[in-house]
């Protein structure tokens, strides 16, 4: 298993996001949206924190937090922090 650095949610404002190479395949996007909606529901109902793995210009990173909303192009975490869906690799 490869080590993926975890950053504090507050540091996401300094991250430059990059599209993940599989973000354009329809099957991947559909599956990812289903997972994001499941995690969002869990976060809103149970205040559960999940790990979001994403692509940045400096490499693959992860952040742990509660997902509050899933939009068309972005997800919203606490403190009005957004991550582009096209950068997200996985949600755990």
Can you describe what each PLM-predicted range is?
Residues 69-75:
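Short, conserved beta-turn/loop elements at beta-strand boundaries and strand-helix junctions
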Residues 1-60, 82-85, 90-92:
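Short glycine-rich, low-complexity segments
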Residues 61-69:
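Short beta-strand-centered aromatic/proline hotspots
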Residues 76-77, 91:
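Short hydrophobic/aromatic-rich beta-strand segments that constitute the beta-sheet cores
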